[in-house]
Regions:
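Hydrophobic anchor at the start of a short beta-strand
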Residues: 20-22, 48-50, 130, 201, ...
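C-terminal low-complexity, glycine/proline- and small-hydrophobic-enriched intrinsically disordered tails
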Residues: 21-22, 134, 358
Length: 379
């Protein structure tokens, strides 16, 4: 999957972007996401026409020909030659929560940040047991140093402590130790907040980009806790760079965590036991965003994987959340200013978490893909 999408991106980079007309052709499957690339290209190359055509079966060349003269937009083409635009469901007021939703939940990327807030709210509304999985180690807080989540402050405290003890760590070593300590502190805080709701919570180191790590972690969960009934895939990384500058290594890193990671999990669990699946996608996959061609493709794959799961598991609530930018998420100060200038407000942490939990537990089952946040126009 990753190689296939890199080949497409690399081919686009070699096309003249001034006035170019690019049609990205793909067959509908759970592991394809070229529509994300087309949408990112339209943001980065406004003078070009980049579209994706997704074939919903065996479509002949004769059936495709008439669409070459149509206005450029992303479409799904059926074997009879008819086409429709890619659409998603509206965010509606969900129905009341069922009486009990307790089960065994696996949450990737769920011990820190935005996904942690969603996991806490989900625990509050559902109960059950939560296994939070992430790459960070649950490192104990260093002895003799006061707790703080401010990285700059902690680096200073650690440097002063090292001097008192006659140690001479490098700035890079201090930074790494500080980040590791804060990660451990945040993990323990999330576990405590989930337990405060009455649910149970455990942390398990697991790197979704590493198939071996996922296999071992899920075997442990299966042996100790049983079958997973709820999956929340929130793990993800960014490597923002314009298409012309994008490297294969960056794309691989983004795909490994977000897209490949999901399939590593799905191939190691009993999918028939799933009752809820919540996938953290991004509005950049639906609207495109400058510098995020790889991230848009990886998240578009999540949307298609969600549709495939919805078809495979008709009794399972499957939701793909195309999130806009969050307060306290991966949006730094510079990017926050960019969105503000474009009229795209950040999603408040508490409000976003409540939307997530209520939609996943009680939203309309027919609405698989949802945009949460303001519609992007010219971002």
């Amino acid at each position: 999957m990753t190689v296939r999408h890199w080949v497409a991106l690399d081919a686009c980079r070699k096309a003249p972007n001034a006035g170019a007309a690019l049609v990205l052709l793909q067959r509908m499957s759970a592991d394809t996401g070229l529509e994300g690339l087309a949408r990112a290209l339209r943001r980065e190359w406004p003078d070009s026409a980049a579209v994706s055509w997704t074939l919903l079966g065996n479509v002949s060349g004769e059936m495709l020909a008439p669409w070459l003269t149509q206005p450029g937009e992303d479409i799904w083409i059926s074997p009879d030659g008819t086409a429709r635009r890619a659409t998603l469901g509206p965010l509606l007021t969900p129905s009341p929560l069922p009486a009990s939703q307790a089960g065994l939940w696996l949450v990737t990327g769920g011990a820190r940040g935005v996904t942690a807030a969603c996991a806490i709210e989900l625990a509050r509304q559902s109960g059950g047991t939560f296994i939070l999985a992430g790459r960070s180690a649950e490192t104990p807080w260093p002895t003799g140093i006061r707790e703080t989540t401010d990285l700059k402050t902690l680096r200073g405290l650690m440097a002063s402590s090292a001097v008192r003890h006659g140690e001479k760590p490098s700035p890079a070593e201090i930074d790494k130790a500080a980040r590791t300590a804060i990660a451990g502190l945040e993990i323990r805080s999330t576990l405590a907040q989930i337990k405060a709701t009455g649910a149970d919570a455990r942390y398990l180191p697991m790197d979704t980009s590493d198939a071996g790590s996922v296999t071992a972690a899920l075997a442990h969960i299966r042996q100790r806790y049983g079958a997973i009934s709820g999956l929340v895939h929130g793990a993800g990384v960014l490597a923002d760079r314009l298409v012309e500058e994008k490297t294969e290594a960056e794309l691989r890193r983004v795909f490994a965590t977000k897209a490949e990671g999901l399939f590593h999990i799905l191939s190691n669990i009993d999918r028939a036991a799933l009752r809820h699946v919540g996938l953290f996608s991004s509005a950049s996959a639906f609207f495109g965003n400058r510098g995020q061609s790889d991230y848009a493709m990886a998240n578009a794959i999540l949307a298609n994987a969600g549709r495939a799961l919805h078809a495979e598991l008709p009794g399972t609530q499957v939701k793909v959340f195309d999130w806009g930018p969050w307060e306290g998420g991966m949006v730094d100060a510079t990017l926050a200013r960019h969105f503000k200038e474009k009229g795209v407000p950040l999603i408040p942490l508490g409000e976003g978490a409540r939307i997530f939990a209520h939609e996943l537990l009680a939203g309309d089952p027919s609405d698989v893909e949802l945009i949460v946040g303001t519609v992007w126009s010219n971002t």
